[in-house]
Every structure is written in structure tokens, then in C-alpha cells.
């Protein structure tokens, strides 16, 4: 009799459990749908991967710290007499330019210190982001700041110095300003020059930013990729 009662109780329990699952709301909320922006980012990263995949096997991947060390050391290999020019566009708080300055005699940093000149389209930052209200950060002694909008300062600098440009760290973020800089400096760039982009790939809007400016200024046969940052958006090319 006891065994029969136990079977009956188990049977009733299964019925009640079934009724609960069908009639009562689930205690687990349904999975959230991706927002349009999240879907956009996901598709951008996938498209970015397919675009850069052919270059990955011919380049190296480094973490953020080693990436910056690699690009400046690679540029130094092309400057036997330490007479070539090293430029950074987009200084902001001076972190990278101070790092690069430890490897070279002089490095020039172009920045208005008033933030982005235009909206960062395809991404999340509006005009004016990174604004320091014209206040310069602490810079090493061999860092020479070129203060003002690059559209006003770059051409006079090039005309006055006739530089042999061996290294460019491009951190202007947006397409318009990056395109302006690349177009103006291209005639002064030497063979094997390293151009490092701080936001070239691996983020939403990559295709309409620095990458677009690069593709419109240089032909594919004029450069090769040498390094990608494995945990960031940075990538570097070397002029052939």
C-alpha cells in the first residue's frame, strides 16, 4: 500500500509541475533583444574582420603597450642619422607623444586642445569631445607642440621645414581631419615611414573614419600593414 501511495504522490507532483509551467509566468525573464546600436556594432566588427583578415597573417598582433613600443622602434630603424621628422596628430593629454619622445631627439605634436573639430560619425562622440580648453598637458622637453587647428598650422609647418617624415602617429579620430592631414603630408613621407592609426579598425564606424581617409589617400600598393593592436583599435602601416 505504501508503494502505491508514493507512486500516486509522484504522479500528482508531475501534474502540478506541468500546470505550473503552463499556467504560471516563468520566473526567468525572456532574453533581451539586441538594441539597434548593439546590432550595428556587432555587424561592424564582423565586416571589419572580413576586410582585414587577408592582412592579419602578414602582420603581428601586440598588446597596447608593446604596440606603441614596436611602431616607434620600427621607425627608428629607418633613421640612421637621427635627422628625420616624427609627428603626432592629436596630442590630447600627451600620453603617447611623451612615450615616443623617449626614443627620438624631437617630436612635434599637432593639436588645438579644443577637442574634435567635427562629430565622430558612425561612433559615439560629438564635436568638442576631448576639449582641454586650450590648456596644454605636461610634455617632455623634446616635445614641440604645434598649437591650433591643424587646418591652419600644418601647411606653414611643412613649407617652413620641408621635413623628411619618418613617423606619423595619427590620432585625429574623424575622417575629415585625417584626410586633410594625410593629403598634405604625403609628398613629404619617406620610404619605410611608419604611419600608425589610433582608431583604424575593430570599432563601430571604422569604415567611415581614419580607414576611409587612408584608402582615399594611398593606393593599396603604396603600403603594407605591419602591426595590429590585439586589444584595441590601433593598426600601423609601413610605406613601401
Predicted regions and their residues:
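A broad, low-specificity signal for short, low-complexity segments enriched in glycine/proline
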Residues: 45-50, 65-71, 157-159, 201
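Conserved alpha-helix/loop element of class I SAM-dependent methyltransferases that forms part
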Residues: 65-83
Amino acid at each position: 500500500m505504501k508503494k502505491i501511495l508514493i507512486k500516486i504522490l509522484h504522479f500528482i507532483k508531475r501534474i502540478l509541475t506541468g500546470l505550473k509551467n503552463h499556467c504560471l509566468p516563468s520566473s526567468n525573464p525572456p532574453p533581451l533583444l539586441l538594441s539597434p546600436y548593439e546590432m550595428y556594432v556587432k555587424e561592424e566588427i564582423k565586416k571589419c574582420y572580413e576586410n582585414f583578415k587577408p592582412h592579419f597573417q602578414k602582420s603581428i598582433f601586440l598588446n597596447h603597450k608593446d604596440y606603441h613600443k614596436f611602431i616607434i622602434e620600427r621607425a627608428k630603424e629607418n633613421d640612421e642619422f637621427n635627422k628625420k621628422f616624427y609627428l603626432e596628430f592629436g596630442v590630447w593629454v600627451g600620453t603617447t607623444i611623451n612615450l615616443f619622445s623617449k626614443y627620438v631627439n624631437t617630436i612635434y605634436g599637432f593639436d588645438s586642445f579644443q577637442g574634435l573639430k567635427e562629430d565622430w560619425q558612425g561612433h559615439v562622440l560629438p564635436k568638442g569631445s576631448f576639449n582641454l580648453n586650450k590648456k596644454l598637458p605636461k610634455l617632455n622637453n623634446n616635445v614641440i607642440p604645434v598649437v591650433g587647428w591643424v587646418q591652419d598650422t600644418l601647411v606653414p609647418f611643412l613649407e617652413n621645414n620641408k621635413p623628411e617624415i619618418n613617423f606619423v602617429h595619427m590620432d585625429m579620430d574623424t575622417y575629415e581631419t585625417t584626410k586633410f592631414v594625410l593629403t598634405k603630408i604625403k609628398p613629404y613621407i619617406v620610404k619605410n615611414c611608419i604611419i600608425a592609426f589610433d582608431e583604424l579598425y575593430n570599432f563601430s564606424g571604422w569604415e567611415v573614419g581614419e580607414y576611409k581617409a587612408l584608402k582615399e589617400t594611398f593606393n593599396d600598393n603604396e603600403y603594407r600593414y605591419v602591426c595590429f593592436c590585439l586589444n584595441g583599435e590601433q593598426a600601423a602601416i609601413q610605406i613601401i
